UniProtKB/Swiss-Prot annotation:
Disulphide bridges: C28-C75, C63-C114, C187-C440, C257-C274, C283-C291, C506-C520
Keywords assigned by UniProt, alphabetized: Calcium, Carbohydrate metabolism, Disulfide bond, Glycoprotein, Hydrolase, Metal-binding, Polysaccharide degradation, Secreted, Serine esterase, Signal, Xylan degradation
Catalytic activity field: feruloyl-polysaccharide + H2O = ferulate + polysaccharide
Organism superkingdom: Eukaryota
UniProt protein name: Probable feruloyl esterase B-2
Active-site annotation: S188 (acyl-ester intermediate), D399 (charge relay system), H439 (charge relay system)
GO BP terms, alphabetized: xylan catabolic process
Function as written in the Swiss-Prot or TrEMBL entry: Involved in degradation of plant cell walls. Hydrolyzes the feruloyl-arabinose ester bond in arabinoxylans as well as the feruloyl-galactose and feruloyl-arabinose ester bonds in pectin.
Signal sequence extent: 1-19
Residues carrying covalently attached carbohydrate according to the record: N13, N53, N85, N98, N138, N235, N419
Family, per entry: Belongs to the tannase family.
The organism of origin for this protein: Aspergillus flavus (strain ATCC 200026 / FGSC A1120 / IAM 13836 / NRRL 3357 / JCM 12722 / SRRC 167)
GO cellular component: extracellular region
Protein backbone atom coordinates (compact mmCIF):
# COMPACT_ATOMS: atom_id res chain seq x y z
CA UNK A 1 0.00 0.00 0.00
CA UNK A 2 1.03 3.59 -0.57
CA UNK A 3 2.34 5.54 2.40
CA UNK A 4 -0.39 8.17 2.15
CA UNK A 5 -3.02 5.45 2.42
CA UNK A 6 -1.31 3.96 5.46
CA UNK A 7 -1.36 7.33 7.19
CA UNK A 8 -5.05 7.67 6.43
CA UNK A 9 -5.70 4.20 7.78
CA UNK A 10 -3.69 4.97 10.89
CA UNK A 11 -5.78 8.09 11.36
CA UNK A 12 -3.16 10.08 13.26
CA UNK A 13 -4.60 13.48 14.11
CA UNK A 14 -1.79 15.96 14.62
CA UNK A 15 -4.18 18.37 16.33
CA UNK A 16 -4.13 15.97 19.28
CA UNK A 17 -0.49 16.81 20.05
CA UNK A 18 0.04 16.98 23.80
CA UNK A 19 1.97 19.34 26.00
CA UNK A 20 4.21 16.53 27.16
CA UNK A 21 6.59 18.76 29.06
CA UNK A 22 4.12 19.73 31.79
CA UNK A 23 3.21 16.33 33.23
CA UNK A 24 4.92 13.60 31.25
CA UNK A 25 3.30 10.57 32.93
CA UNK A 26 -0.20 12.03 32.62
CA UNK A 27 0.44 13.13 29.04
CA UNK A 28 1.52 9.62 28.17
CA UNK A 29 -1.45 7.93 29.80
CA UNK A 30 -3.81 10.33 28.02
CA UNK A 31 -2.14 9.90 24.64
CA UNK A 32 -4.53 8.13 22.31
CA UNK A 33 -3.73 8.55 18.62
CA UNK A 34 -6.73 7.72 16.51
CA UNK A 35 -6.24 4.19 15.18
CA UNK A 36 -9.88 3.27 14.69
CA UNK A 37 -9.39 2.23 11.06
CA UNK A 38 -9.83 -1.51 10.63
CA UNK A 39 -6.22 -2.33 9.91
CA UNK A 40 -4.46 -0.22 12.55
CA UNK A 41 -5.12 -0.98 16.20
CA UNK A 42 -3.55 0.62 19.25
CA UNK A 43 -2.84 -2.24 21.61
CA UNK A 44 -1.81 -0.08 24.54
CA UNK A 45 -0.06 3.06 25.72
CA UNK A 46 1.84 3.05 29.02
CA UNK A 47 4.16 5.28 30.97
CA UNK A 48 7.43 3.54 31.88
CA UNK A 49 9.54 5.32 34.53
CA UNK A 50 13.32 5.20 34.59
CA UNK A 51 14.69 2.16 36.41
CA UNK A 52 11.86 -0.16 35.37
CA UNK A 53 12.74 -3.75 34.54
CA UNK A 54 10.03 -4.04 31.92
CA UNK A 55 8.41 -7.47 31.76
CA UNK A 56 7.60 -8.72 28.25
CA UNK A 57 5.26 -11.66 28.91
CA UNK A 58 3.73 -11.68 25.44
CA UNK A 59 7.06 -11.72 23.61
CA UNK A 60 7.65 -15.04 21.85
CA UNK A 61 9.88 -17.21 24.04
CA UNK A 62 12.24 -17.99 21.14
CA UNK A 63 13.14 -14.30 20.99
CA UNK A 64 14.87 -14.75 24.38
CA UNK A 65 13.86 -11.30 25.59
CA UNK A 66 11.65 -11.82 28.66
CA UNK A 67 12.38 -8.38 30.07
CA UNK A 68 14.20 -5.12 29.40
CA UNK A 69 15.68 -2.56 31.77
CA UNK A 70 14.60 0.98 30.90
CA UNK A 71 16.92 3.77 32.08
CA UNK A 72 14.87 6.88 31.21
CA UNK A 73 11.26 7.96 31.56
CA UNK A 74 9.37 7.12 28.40
CA UNK A 75 5.96 6.63 26.86
CA UNK A 76 5.50 3.21 25.26
CA UNK A 77 3.00 2.87 22.40
CA UNK A 78 2.20 -0.51 20.84
CA UNK A 79 0.32 -0.94 17.57
CA UNK A 80 -0.97 -3.88 15.58
CA UNK A 81 -1.27 -3.15 11.86
CA UNK A 82 -2.83 -5.45 9.27
CA UNK A 83 -0.80 -5.40 6.07
CA UNK A 84 -3.09 -7.75 4.15
CA UNK A 85 -5.85 -10.22 4.88
CA UNK A 86 -3.21 -12.77 5.92
CA UNK A 87 -0.37 -10.71 7.38
CA UNK A 88 0.25 -8.11 10.07
CA UNK A 89 2.99 -6.18 11.84
CA UNK A 90 3.38 -5.47 15.54
CA UNK A 91 5.14 -2.16 16.13
CA UNK A 92 6.31 -0.35 19.25
CA UNK A 93 7.25 3.32 19.52
CA UNK A 94 9.19 4.44 22.60
CA UNK A 95 8.96 8.18 23.27
CA UNK A 96 11.45 9.46 25.88
CA UNK A 97 10.92 12.44 28.14
CA UNK A 98 14.40 13.69 27.17
CA UNK A 99 13.62 13.80 23.43
CA UNK A 100 16.31 15.48 21.33
CA UNK A 101 14.19 15.88 18.22
CA UNK A 102 15.75 12.80 16.65
CA UNK A 103 14.01 9.65 15.39
CA UNK A 104 15.56 6.17 15.27
CA UNK A 105 14.41 3.08 13.40
CA UNK A 106 15.75 -0.31 14.47
CA UNK A 107 16.19 -3.59 12.64
CA UNK A 108 15.89 -7.31 13.28
CA UNK A 109 18.17 -10.34 13.05
CA UNK A 110 18.43 -13.79 11.49
CA UNK A 111 15.10 -14.79 9.96
CA UNK A 112 13.28 -13.72 13.08
CA UNK A 113 10.31 -11.66 14.05
CA UNK A 114 11.67 -10.26 17.29
CA UNK A 115 11.56 -6.65 18.38
CA UNK A 116 15.03 -5.71 19.63
CA UNK A 117 13.92 -4.17 22.88
CA UNK A 118 17.53 -3.58 23.89
CA UNK A 119 17.90 -1.25 20.90
CA UNK A 120 14.67 0.56 21.75
CA UNK A 121 15.98 1.14 25.28
CA UNK A 122 19.37 2.24 23.94
CA UNK A 123 17.87 4.72 21.50
CA UNK A 124 15.47 6.16 24.07
CA UNK A 125 18.29 6.51 26.62
CA UNK A 126 20.11 8.73 24.14
CA UNK A 127 17.09 10.92 23.44
CA UNK A 128 15.72 9.33 20.27
CA UNK A 129 12.07 8.60 19.64
CA UNK A 130 12.60 5.01 18.56
CA UNK A 131 10.57 2.40 16.71
CA UNK A 132 10.89 -1.36 16.31
CA UNK A 133 8.71 -4.10 14.87
CA UNK A 134 8.34 -7.87 14.83
CA UNK A 135 9.08 -7.76 11.08
CA UNK A 136 5.74 -9.34 10.27
CA UNK A 137 5.89 -12.56 12.28
CA UNK A 138 6.58 -13.76 15.82
CA UNK A 139 9.57 -15.78 16.93
CA UNK A 140 12.69 -17.07 15.23
CA UNK A 141 11.27 -19.61 12.78
CA UNK A 142 10.60 -19.15 9.07
CA UNK A 143 7.52 -21.38 9.10
CA UNK A 144 5.12 -18.46 8.64
CA UNK A 145 6.75 -17.65 5.27
CA UNK A 146 5.51 -20.90 3.74
CA UNK A 147 3.21 -20.13 0.81
CA UNK A 148 2.58 -16.61 2.12
CA UNK A 149 4.15 -13.85 0.04
CA UNK A 150 2.53 -11.18 2.22
CA UNK A 151 4.41 -12.28 5.34
CA UNK A 152 7.56 -12.40 3.20
CA UNK A 153 6.90 -8.85 2.02
CA UNK A 154 6.65 -7.70 5.63
CA UNK A 155 9.93 -9.47 6.41
CA UNK A 156 11.84 -8.25 3.36
CA UNK A 157 10.88 -4.57 3.35
CA UNK A 158 7.38 -3.56 4.39
CA UNK A 159 7.51 -3.88 8.18
CA UNK A 160 10.46 -1.51 8.58
CA UNK A 161 9.15 1.07 6.13
CA UNK A 162 5.61 1.00 7.49
CA UNK A 163 6.82 1.17 11.10
CA UNK A 164 9.06 4.11 10.24
CA UNK A 165 6.27 6.08 8.59
CA UNK A 166 3.85 5.38 11.43
CA UNK A 167 6.50 5.97 14.07
CA UNK A 168 7.30 9.42 12.72
CA UNK A 169 3.64 10.42 12.72
CA UNK A 170 3.12 9.12 16.26
CA UNK A 171 6.23 11.05 17.32
CA UNK A 172 4.88 14.29 15.89
CA UNK A 173 1.48 13.72 17.44
CA UNK A 174 2.99 13.13 20.87
CA UNK A 175 5.54 15.94 21.00
CA UNK A 176 3.61 18.46 18.93
CA UNK A 177 6.40 18.92 16.41
CA UNK A 178 8.09 16.74 13.78
CA UNK A 179 11.46 15.11 14.22
CA UNK A 180 14.47 17.06 12.99
CA UNK A 181 16.57 14.13 11.75
CA UNK A 182 15.89 10.44 11.27
CA UNK A 183 18.37 7.61 11.80
CA UNK A 184 18.53 3.83 11.53
CA UNK A 185 20.48 1.25 13.53
CA UNK A 186 20.69 -2.44 12.63
CA UNK A 187 23.11 -5.35 12.35
CA UNK A 188 23.15 -8.62 10.39
CA UNK A 189 19.66 -8.91 8.87
CA UNK A 190 19.20 -5.43 10.32
CA UNK A 191 22.22 -4.31 8.31
CA UNK A 192 20.57 -5.62 5.16
CA UNK A 193 17.37 -3.82 6.10
CA UNK A 194 19.30 -0.57 6.37
CA UNK A 195 20.92 -0.92 2.95
CA UNK A 196 17.59 -1.90 1.40
CA UNK A 197 15.96 1.15 2.95
CA UNK A 198 18.57 3.42 1.34
CA UNK A 199 17.72 1.88 -2.03
CA UNK A 200 13.94 1.56 -1.87
CA UNK A 201 12.98 4.34 0.56
CA UNK A 202 15.80 6.91 0.51
CA UNK A 203 13.71 9.50 2.34
CA UNK A 204 13.08 7.32 5.40
CA UNK A 205 16.42 7.98 7.10
CA UNK A 206 18.99 10.78 7.02
CA UNK A 207 21.64 8.42 8.35
CA UNK A 208 21.98 4.64 8.44
CA UNK A 209 24.17 2.28 10.46
CA UNK A 210 24.26 -1.08 8.69
CA UNK A 211 26.42 -3.47 10.72
CA UNK A 212 27.63 -6.83 9.39
CA UNK A 213 25.02 -6.50 6.65
CA UNK A 214 23.40 -9.65 5.27
CA UNK A 215 23.59 -8.27 1.73
CA UNK A 216 23.44 -10.62 -1.25
CA UNK A 217 20.99 -12.37 1.03
CA UNK A 218 20.06 -15.34 -1.15
CA UNK A 219 23.71 -16.24 -1.69
CA UNK A 220 24.41 -15.82 2.02
CA UNK A 221 21.67 -18.34 2.80
CA UNK A 222 23.21 -20.78 0.31
CA UNK A 223 26.75 -20.22 1.60
CA UNK A 224 25.64 -21.07 5.12
CA UNK A 225 23.76 -24.12 3.83
CA UNK A 226 26.94 -25.37 2.15
CA UNK A 227 28.81 -26.05 5.39
CA UNK A 228 26.76 -29.06 6.47
CA UNK A 229 27.59 -31.08 3.32
CA UNK A 230 31.23 -29.98 3.68
CA UNK A 231 31.69 -30.93 7.34
CA UNK A 232 29.37 -33.92 7.33
CA UNK A 233 27.26 -35.00 10.26
CA UNK A 234 28.72 -35.30 13.75
CA UNK A 235 28.92 -39.10 13.45
CA UNK A 236 30.66 -39.15 10.06
CA UNK A 237 34.15 -40.62 9.79
CA UNK A 238 36.11 -37.42 9.18
CA UNK A 239 33.98 -35.00 11.17
CA UNK A 240 36.02 -32.29 12.88
CA UNK A 241 34.71 -31.69 16.37
CA UNK A 242 33.80 -28.25 17.65
CA UNK A 243 36.61 -28.44 20.21
CA UNK A 244 39.14 -29.25 17.47
CA UNK A 245 38.07 -26.17 15.54
CA UNK A 246 38.31 -23.98 18.62
CA UNK A 247 41.54 -25.36 20.04
CA UNK A 248 43.75 -26.98 17.43
CA UNK A 249 42.71 -25.16 14.25
CA UNK A 250 42.16 -21.72 15.76
CA UNK A 251 45.54 -21.92 17.50
CA UNK A 252 47.23 -22.75 14.20
CA UNK A 253 45.46 -19.86 12.46
CA UNK A 254 46.87 -17.52 15.10
CA UNK A 255 50.32 -19.11 14.82
CA UNK A 256 50.37 -18.41 11.10
CA UNK A 257 48.65 -15.03 11.03
CA UNK A 258 48.44 -13.24 14.39
CA UNK A 259 51.75 -11.42 14.06
CA UNK A 260 51.12 -10.17 10.53
CA UNK A 261 50.10 -6.93 12.25
CA UNK A 262 53.32 -6.94 14.33
CA UNK A 263 51.46 -7.63 17.59
CA UNK A 264 51.00 -11.05 19.20
CA UNK A 265 47.64 -10.45 20.90
CA UNK A 266 45.31 -13.19 19.66
CA UNK A 267 43.70 -10.77 17.19
CA UNK A 268 44.18 -10.76 13.42
CA UNK A 269 43.91 -7.12 12.41
CA UNK A 270 43.37 -7.84 8.70
CA UNK A 271 42.30 -11.43 7.88
CA UNK A 272 42.54 -10.72 4.15
CA UNK A 273 46.33 -10.90 4.58
CA UNK A 274 46.14 -14.37 6.16
CA UNK A 275 46.82 -17.18 3.69
CA UNK A 276 46.11 -20.01 6.07
CA UNK A 277 47.68 -23.38 5.20
CA UNK A 278 45.83 -26.24 6.93
CA UNK A 279 48.49 -28.71 5.75
CA UNK A 280 50.53 -27.60 8.75
CA UNK A 281 48.14 -29.69 10.87
CA UNK A 282 48.32 -32.84 8.76
CA UNK A 283 49.13 -36.05 10.62
CA UNK A 284 52.53 -37.60 9.90
CA UNK A 285 54.53 -40.57 11.14
CA UNK A 286 56.01 -38.28 13.77
CA UNK A 287 52.73 -36.55 14.63
CA UNK A 288 49.83 -38.85 15.33
CA UNK A 289 47.97 -36.76 17.93
CA UNK A 290 46.54 -33.25 17.73
CA UNK A 291 46.54 -33.39 13.97
CA UNK A 292 44.18 -33.75 11.02
CA UNK A 293 43.72 -36.58 8.55
CA UNK A 294 44.12 -35.79 4.84
CA UNK A 295 40.33 -35.76 4.49
CA UNK A 296 40.01 -33.34 7.40
CA UNK A 297 42.64 -31.05 5.91
CA UNK A 298 40.53 -30.94 2.76
CA UNK A 299 37.44 -30.08 4.81
CA UNK A 300 39.27 -27.15 6.38
CA UNK A 301 40.47 -26.02 2.96
CA UNK A 302 36.90 -26.06 1.63
CA UNK A 303 35.61 -24.14 4.64
CA UNK A 304 38.12 -21.37 3.95
CA UNK A 305 37.46 -21.28 0.19
CA UNK A 306 35.04 -19.07 -1.75
CA UNK A 307 31.80 -20.60 -3.00
CA UNK A 308 31.44 -20.77 -6.78
CA UNK A 309 28.39 -21.51 -8.91
CA UNK A 310 27.58 -23.82 -11.78
CA UNK A 311 29.14 -21.47 -14.33
CA UNK A 312 32.18 -20.70 -12.23
CA UNK A 313 30.90 -17.36 -10.98
CA UNK A 314 31.45 -16.29 -7.40
CA UNK A 315 28.45 -16.98 -5.19
CA UNK A 316 29.96 -15.89 -1.88
CA UNK A 317 33.46 -15.13 -0.56
CA UNK A 318 35.39 -17.35 1.81
CA UNK A 319 35.07 -17.49 5.56
CA UNK A 320 37.84 -15.34 7.02
CA UNK A 321 40.52 -17.03 9.15
CA UNK A 322 40.20 -16.23 12.84
CA UNK A 323 36.44 -16.82 12.98
CA UNK A 324 36.68 -20.37 14.30
CA UNK A 325 35.59 -19.70 17.89
CA UNK A 326 32.15 -18.52 16.77
CA UNK A 327 31.78 -20.40 13.49
CA UNK A 328 32.43 -23.76 15.17
CA UNK A 329 29.31 -23.28 17.28
CA UNK A 330 27.22 -21.95 14.41
CA UNK A 331 28.23 -23.51 11.10
CA UNK A 332 30.54 -26.48 11.78
CA UNK A 333 28.45 -28.40 14.32
CA UNK A 334 27.61 -31.37 12.13
CA UNK A 335 24.03 -30.12 11.85
CA UNK A 336 22.33 -27.95 9.22
CA UNK A 337 22.44 -24.23 9.92
CA UNK A 338 18.83 -23.64 10.95
CA UNK A 339 18.24 -20.32 9.17
CA UNK A 340 19.35 -21.79 5.84
CA UNK A 341 17.50 -25.04 6.38
CA UNK A 342 14.23 -23.25 7.10
CA UNK A 343 14.65 -20.75 4.28
CA UNK A 344 14.95 -23.56 1.75
CA UNK A 345 12.13 -25.54 3.36
CA UNK A 346 9.63 -22.71 3.77
CA UNK A 347 10.57 -20.25 1.02
CA UNK A 348 12.55 -21.89 -1.78
CA UNK A 349 11.19 -25.45 -1.80
CA UNK A 350 8.97 -27.19 0.75
CA UNK A 351 9.26 -28.73 4.23
CA UNK A 352 10.46 -32.07 2.85
CA UNK A 353 13.70 -30.60 1.49
CA UNK A 354 16.79 -32.36 2.87
CA UNK A 355 19.65 -29.99 3.82
CA UNK A 356 22.17 -32.82 3.45
CA UNK A 357 21.45 -32.77 -0.28
CA UNK A 358 22.29 -29.09 -0.78
CA UNK A 359 24.45 -28.33 -3.82
CA UNK A 360 25.33 -25.31 -5.95
CA UNK A 361 22.25 -25.75 -8.15
CA UNK A 362 20.11 -25.00 -5.10
CA UNK A 363 22.00 -21.72 -4.76
CA UNK A 364 20.96 -20.79 -8.30
CA UNK A 365 17.34 -21.71 -7.63
CA UNK A 366 17.29 -19.58 -4.48
CA UNK A 367 18.82 -16.54 -6.16
CA UNK A 368 16.61 -16.84 -9.23
CA UNK A 369 13.56 -16.94 -6.95
CA UNK A 370 14.71 -13.84 -5.01
CA UNK A 371 11.39 -13.41 -3.18
CA UNK A 372 10.34 -9.80 -2.63
CA UNK A 373 13.69 -8.78 -4.15
CA UNK A 374 15.35 -9.66 -0.86
CA UNK A 375 18.77 -10.10 -2.50
CA UNK A 376 19.91 -6.55 -1.59
CA UNK A 377 22.94 -6.12 -3.83
CA UNK A 378 22.41 -2.65 -5.30
CA UNK A 379 24.52 -1.17 -8.07
CA UNK A 380 23.55 2.37 -7.24
CA UNK A 381 22.90 4.40 -4.09
CA UNK A 382 22.89 7.74 -5.88
CA UNK A 383 19.32 8.61 -4.86
CA UNK A 384 20.31 8.28 -1.24
CA UNK A 385 23.55 10.16 -1.81
CA UNK A 386 21.78 13.03 -3.62
CA UNK A 387 19.34 13.60 -0.77
CA UNK A 388 22.32 13.98 1.58
CA UNK A 389 22.05 10.59 3.26
CA UNK A 390 25.02 9.05 5.09
CA UNK A 391 25.75 5.36 5.67
CA UNK A 392 28.20 3.77 8.08
CA UNK A 393 28.73 0.04 7.85
CA UNK A 394 30.99 -2.08 10.03
CA UNK A 395 31.95 -5.72 10.24
CA UNK A 396 33.74 -7.80 12.88
CA UNK A 397 36.88 -9.40 11.49
CA UNK A 398 36.21 -12.58 13.50
CA UNK A 399 32.56 -12.88 12.46
CA UNK A 400 31.58 -16.55 12.45
CA UNK A 401 28.12 -16.12 10.93
CA UNK A 402 28.69 -13.79 7.96
CA UNK A 403 32.18 -13.57 6.54
CA UNK A 404 33.56 -10.05 6.81
CA UNK A 405 34.96 -10.44 3.31
CA UNK A 406 31.43 -9.96 1.98
CA UNK A 407 31.18 -6.40 3.27
CA UNK A 408 34.57 -5.59 1.76
CA UNK A 409 33.27 -7.11 -1.47
CA UNK A 410 30.12 -4.96 -1.22
CA UNK A 411 32.12 -1.78 -0.68
CA UNK A 412 34.27 -2.53 -3.73
CA UNK A 413 31.18 -3.47 -5.74
CA UNK A 414 29.57 -0.11 -5.00
CA UNK A 415 32.75 1.79 -5.88
CA UNK A 416 32.99 -0.01 -9.22
CA UNK A 417 29.28 0.11 -10.08
CA UNK A 418 29.00 3.81 -9.19
CA UNK A 419 32.33 4.60 -10.87
CA UNK A 420 33.70 6.14 -7.69
CA UNK A 421 37.10 6.13 -6.04
CA UNK A 422 37.26 5.20 -2.37
CA UNK A 423 37.52 8.87 -1.43
CA UNK A 424 34.42 9.68 -3.48
CA UNK A 425 32.41 6.80 -2.04
CA UNK A 426 33.51 7.80 1.45
CA UNK A 427 31.71 11.12 1.00
CA UNK A 428 28.50 9.31 1.95
CA UNK A 429 29.35 5.63 2.59
CA UNK A 430 32.03 4.55 5.07
CA UNK A 431 33.08 1.05 6.12
CA UNK A 432 34.89 0.19 9.37
CA UNK A 433 36.58 -3.17 9.93
CA UNK A 434 36.41 -4.12 13.61
CA UNK A 435 39.32 -6.37 14.50
CA UNK A 436 38.68 -9.01 17.14
CA UNK A 437 34.89 -8.74 16.96
CA UNK A 438 32.53 -11.64 16.29
CA UNK A 439 29.06 -11.29 14.77
CA UNK A 440 27.81 -7.78 15.62
CA UNK A 441 29.33 -7.94 19.13
CA UNK A 442 31.61 -9.87 21.51
CA UNK A 443 35.05 -11.31 20.84
CA UNK A 444 38.59 -10.69 22.14
CA UNK A 445 38.94 -7.28 20.50
CA UNK A 446 37.78 -3.77 21.34
CA UNK A 447 34.25 -4.46 20.16
CA UNK A 448 32.02 -2.08 22.13
CA UNK A 449 31.45 1.19 20.27
CA UNK A 450 27.80 2.08 20.71
CA UNK A 451 26.48 -0.27 18.03
CA UNK A 452 23.42 -1.45 19.93
CA UNK A 453 21.69 -2.11 23.16
CA UNK A 454 23.58 -4.98 24.78
CA UNK A 455 25.25 -3.83 28.03
CA UNK A 456 28.78 -3.09 26.82
CA UNK A 457 27.87 -0.99 23.74
CA UNK A 458 25.05 0.70 25.64
CA UNK A 459 27.56 1.98 28.19
CA UNK A 460 29.61 3.71 25.50
CA UNK A 461 29.71 7.50 25.97
CA UNK A 462 27.63 9.29 23.36
CA UNK A 463 30.41 11.08 21.50
CA UNK A 464 31.59 10.79 17.92
CA UNK A 465 34.96 9.28 18.77
CA UNK A 466 33.72 6.28 20.75
CA UNK A 467 30.09 5.82 19.70
CA UNK A 468 29.16 4.92 16.14
CA UNK A 469 25.61 6.26 16.47
CA UNK A 470 26.94 9.57 17.79
CA UNK A 471 29.46 9.59 14.93
CA UNK A 472 26.60 9.21 12.45
CA UNK A 473 24.73 12.09 14.10
CA UNK A 474 27.83 14.29 13.88
CA UNK A 475 28.24 13.43 10.20
CA UNK A 476 24.60 14.10 9.31
CA UNK A 477 24.05 17.19 11.44
CA UNK A 478 27.49 18.83 11.44
CA UNK A 479 29.28 17.40 8.40
CA UNK A 480 32.00 15.78 10.53
CA UNK A 481 32.72 12.42 8.90
CA UNK A 482 34.30 9.72 11.11
CA UNK A 483 37.88 8.74 10.32
CA UNK A 484 38.16 6.20 13.13
CA UNK A 485 35.89 4.60 15.70
CA UNK A 486 37.46 3.85 19.07
CA UNK A 487 36.29 0.54 20.45
CA UNK A 488 36.49 -0.69 24.03
CA UNK A 489 36.97 -4.16 25.45
CA UNK A 490 35.75 -4.37 29.04
CA UNK A 491 37.09 -6.89 31.51
CA UNK A 492 34.98 -10.03 31.02
CA UNK A 493 32.79 -7.83 28.78
CA UNK A 494 31.38 -6.24 31.93
CA UNK A 495 31.59 -2.43 32.03
CA UNK A 496 31.43 -2.51 35.83
CA UNK A 497 34.79 -4.33 35.94
CA UNK A 498 36.66 -1.67 34.01
CA UNK A 499 38.42 -1.37 30.66
CA UNK A 500 40.72 -4.09 29.33
CA UNK A 501 41.82 -2.50 26.03
CA UNK A 502 40.84 0.35 23.74
CA UNK A 503 41.66 0.46 20.06
CA UNK A 504 41.00 2.66 17.05
CA UNK A 505 39.23 1.02 14.12
CA UNK A 506 40.02 2.58 10.77
CA UNK A 507 37.76 3.25 7.85
CA UNK A 508 38.37 0.97 4.90
CA UNK A 509 40.70 0.92 2.95
CA UNK A 510 42.92 2.48 5.60
CA UNK A 511 44.69 0.10 7.98
CA UNK A 512 45.81 0.30 11.59
CA UNK A 513 49.58 0.29 12.03
CA UNK A 514 50.52 -0.99 15.49
CA UNK A 515 54.15 -0.11 14.83
CA UNK A 516 53.21 3.54 14.49
CA UNK A 517 51.45 3.92 17.83
CA UNK A 518 48.18 2.59 16.40
CA UNK A 519 47.81 5.18 13.67
CA UNK A 520 45.60 4.65 10.64
CA UNK A 521 47.49 4.95 7.38
Amino acid sequence: MKVSLWLTLLGVNLSLALAVGTDFPASCQAFSPDTRAANAHREFTEYVPAGTNLSLPYNDATCARPNQVVTVDLCRVALYVETSNRSSVTTEIWLPRNWTGRFLGTGNGGIDGCIKYEDLAYGAANGFAVVGSNNGHNGTTAASFYQNSDVLADFAWRALHLSTVIGKEITQAFYGEPHRKSYYLGCSLGGRQGINSAVEFPDDFDGIIAGSPAVDFNSLVSWRASFFPITGSANSTDFISVSTWKDLIHAEVLTQCDTLDCVNDGIIEDPSLCNFCPEALKCTDDRINNCLSPAQVEIVRKVFSPMYGEDGQLIFPAMQPGSELEAADQLYTGKPFRYSKEWFQYVVYNPSWDPAEFDIHDAKVADDLNPQNIRTWPNDLSNYEKRGGKIITFHGQQDGKITSFNTERFYNHLATAMNMSSSELDNFFRFFRISGMSHCSSGPGAWAFGQGGSPAPAMTPFNGNENILAALVAWVEHGVAPETITGTKYVDDNPELGISIRRSHCRFVIQLNHGRHELCY
